[in-house]
Regions:
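Alpha-helical multi-pass transmembrane bundles of energy-transducing inner-membrane proteins
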Residues: 21-24, 54, 107-198, 283-348
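Transmembrane helix-loop-helix hairpins at membrane boundaries of multipass inner-membrane proteins
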Residues: 1, 11, 15-107, 471
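Structural signature of hydrophobic alpha-helical transmembrane segments
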Residues: 1-8, 72-83, 126-138, 199-210, ...
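C-terminal ends of transmembrane helices
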Residues: 14-23, 87-99, 141-151, 214-228, ...
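Predominantly late transmembrane helices and immediately cytosolic-facing juxtamembrane segments
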Residues: 331-334, 395, 402-433
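Acidic, glycine-rich loop-and-beta core segments that form the ion-binding/anion-interacting portion
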Residues: 224-226, 230-234, 242-328
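Alpha-helical transmembrane segments of multipass membrane proteins
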Residues: 13-17, 88-92, 114-118, 141-145, ...
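Juxtamembrane/interfacial segments at transmembrane-helix boundaries in multi-pass membrane proteins
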Residues: 49-67, 152-154, 168-228, 250-268, ...
Length: 475
């Protein structure tokens, strides 16, 4: 089953290549392939046994030197689902906006889908690193070639170099682990007895790599630039899935393999996370570019997840996982709403927008609902995630958790301010009225809206399968 998930997007690549120069057929083949992959992931979810403690759907395949193993547990399952859910949204959202090299654009996304799924299913630390780094190549091309503005090359190189340099420390840590333990197999490493002193050194190597990807202050510079310059599909996949790689890496490797060091460095993580939350929230209030507002909002939300991941409580870790999934749905939706405006008015500057409810009522309702989700109102997925995250984190460090909770208040402040500024008031004198969202744009937003409320109203659909896997991580 898992091998089918990995192969289906690659079959889509072959289909796109065989479609010749027929761009309409290329898009249909890519969309069909991505939807089929999503259906396979739903089958995976349906067949997952929540009462089984361990990896499921385990498969092995031979390599040059050994047998490599893939499998999913309650943690990785939902990241696979998120990936296969977001990729069709990316393709549909860029259906009309991408005008050049369409074939290679679609190929880049299908290859990226395979790499992302591989990150979440491989049970080998070295393979995780290889796929973790391989993601940089298609993302570099997606930002650099199909970016929206003149600084796209600069943004692509900044994204590439920041993440590559950070990951070099993880590579060194992996080499040390291999010589120490004699294996990079995840289950062997999870049972290995590594001295606390060695754990601390190795943990810092992983931390520097993942801190760039979260991103934490001061490693965040690349993210707003990448979001602003990327195409809509690039922003969707970046916010929807790529920012989750660090959280998954912390949970799967830093906490599981290096538990003593994780406990020792928890105050450091909490301190940097709280600084990042407060800094990014105040910075969001100062932005005038709509995409930058959503980008800095992402920095705050992703750092909230770290409070739960390092809380050493089931409630906190599960809350962080739900919050990551929620952010992977809500943030892409907000980017879609912003780009809908940009496609009509060709500006993202906030000062030009006012009174959009008068001639874009459907857009206004959608933007309102996703803004409520972003500020974590009850019944939204973000509410479940943030409530559980802060409840778990409070048990670990009450003072820093209360400071971090300021991010929720500031999130509500800039969310309500942003919606009020764009939707209400007299019609802007700078912009002529344009049409409301079309059918394609509506169809990209509805699945995201459905999933946001599904997780908020029925969280146990997601919490129950991950419970045993999370319980195994408690120190």
């Amino acid at each position: 089953m898992i091998l089918s998930l990995l192969v289906t997007p690659l079959l889509g690549v072959i289909g796109v290549i065989l479609s010749g120069e027929n761009t309409s057929l290329q898009k249909k083949v890519a969309l069909t392939s991505s939807l089929l992959t999503f259906v396979l992931s739903l089958v995976l979810w349906a067949g997952f046994d929540s009462n089984y403690n361990g990896f499921q759907f385990v498969s092995s395949f031979p390599t040059v030197t050994t047998q490599e193993v893939v499998g999913v547990d309650g943690i990785s399952l939902f990241f696979v689902l998120l990936t296969t859910f977001i990729i069709p949204i990316c393709i549909l959202a860029s259906w009309e906006s991408i005008k050049t090299e369409i074939k290679y654009f679609l190929i880049a996304f299908l290859v990226l889908e395979t790499l992302l799924i591989a990150i979440f299913v491989v049970l080998d630390l070295l393979l995780f690193y290889i796929f973790f780094e391989s993601v940089l190549i298609p993302m570099f091309l997606i930002i650099g070639i199909w970016g929206a503005r003149e600084r796209k090359i600069h943004a692509a190189y900044q994204f590439f170099l920041y993440t590559l340099l950070g990951s070099l420390f993880m590579l060194l840590a992996i080499l040390v682990i291999y010589f120490e333990v004699g294996s990079t197999d995840y289950q062997v490493l999870a049972a290995a007895d590594i001295s606390e002193t060695r754990q601390k050194i190795l943990w810092l190597g992983f931390f520097l790599s993942f801190a760039v990807k979260v991103p934490m202050i001061p490693f965040h510079i690349w993210l707003p630039e990448a979001h602003v310059e990327a195409s809509l599909a690039g922003s969707i996949i970046l916010a929807g899935v790529l920012l989750k790689l660090a959280g998954y890496g912390f949970l799967r490797y830093s906490i599981a393999i290096l538990p003593d060091a994780s406990v020792f460095f928890t105050p450091l993580v909490y301190s940097l996370a709280v600084i990042s939350i407060i800094y990014s929230s105040f910075t969001t209030l100062r932005q005038i570019d709509l995409k930058k507002i959503i980008a800095y909002s992402s920095v705050g939300h992703m750092n909230i997840t770290l409070l739960g991941l390092f809380s050493n409580t089931i409630q906190g870790i599960e809350g962080s996982l739900i919050l990551m999934l929620a952010h992977g749905v809500v943030s892409p939706a907000l980017f879609i709403c912003v780009v809908i405006l940009y496609d009509r008015y060709h500006t993202r500057l906030l000062k030009y927008y006012r009174g959009l409810t008068q001639h874009m009522p459907v857009w206004s309702i959608m933007f309102f609902l996703f803004t409520l989700g972003n500020i974590a109102v009850p019944l939204s997925a973000n509410f479940v995630g943030e409530f559980m995250t802060f409840a778990g984190a409070f048990q670990q460090n009450p003072v820093l958790t209360l400071l971090g909770a300021l991010g929720m208040i500031l999130s509500a402040a800039y969310g309500i301010w942003l919606y009020n500024r764009t939707a209400f008031g007299a019609q802007s004198k700078y912009l002529a009225p344009m049409g409301d969202i079309n059918r394609r744009e509506f169809m990209t937003l509805v699945p995201l809206l459905f999933l946001m409320f599904l997780m908020g109203i029925f969280p146990n659909l997601f919490l129950d399968p991950m419970h045993l896997a999370v319980s195994n991580l408690l120190i």
